[in-house]
Amino acid sequence: MGFLLRREEVLNVEQLQGMLDDSPVRAAQAILIAAKEGVVDAQALLGQILLEGRGIARDEALALRWFQIAAQGGHLMARNMAGRCREHGWGCAIDETAAAREYRLAADAGLDWGQYNYANLLATGRGVAENPQQALALYRQAAEQGHAKSMNLLGRYLEDAQVCPRDLEAAVEWYRRSAEAGDFRGQFSYAAVLADRGQVEAALAWLRKALAGGNLKFLRTAHKALAAASDPQVRALAEAYRQRAVSLS
């Protein structure tokens, strides 16, 4: 859907997303106008830039409000983001039960991120009764849609025989797909399998990718695992992970 900007330009939400990199303030103003005119995609995007403070003053409470408005208009990712706000206390008190409701609605409508986030709560019993079987089913649904994080977790369930028969070959395939889709945890999981199979050079390549993309929590955990690795080349990467974690902390 397009809308007028300064009367002479017609922009759509995809163009505005691109403008955010080059002219964030101007883009934010146009997004705000479109959101107020009822453009649902713009309402969801407004929530995102308010959450991040891109081109506009950061306001988590207002971000949540716009996510809710867009969700009421049928925007599934906005529904998912409303759940994220509830789960993490962005602009509101933490309410995992409310987060679970939002995720479930998004998941039931087929959104991969909703399926993933709802599965995370089901797997840990946060905001909802613990149900690892349902969590696994949702991870699988999301993975089959191409959700990289869910691919890695599905692989973990299959490798560890969590509420399902052990299927190592299927696990490795999901790790590979997750790694190739760019998930740093999937890259680390796939590297671990490759290293165990003696394919050290391939494992090192994936470990370097995971190092470049991983967040602080992951790097700290991965550093410990690498430090205990049997292969000296793999073990040597532990220091790079430690240094990267220090730089991010």
Question: What are these language model-derived features?
Answer:
Residues F3-L5, G214-S249:
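Terminal, low-structured helical/coil segments at or just beyond the last alpha-helical repeat
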Residues R6-E37, D41, L45-G55:
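Alpha-helical segment of the N-proximal tetratricopeptide repeat
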Residues N12-E14, L45-E52, R79, G83-H88, ...:
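Hydrophobic face of amphipathic alpha-helices that form TPR/SEL1-like repeat modules
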Residues M19-Q29, A57-W66, A93-E102, A129-L138, ...:
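Structural signature of tandem alpha-helical TPR/SEL1-like repeats
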Residues S23, E37-V40, E52-R54, D59, ...:
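Short helix-capping/linker turns of helical repeat alpha-solenoids
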Residues E96, D112-V193, Q199:
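Eukaryotic tandem repeat interaction scaffolds
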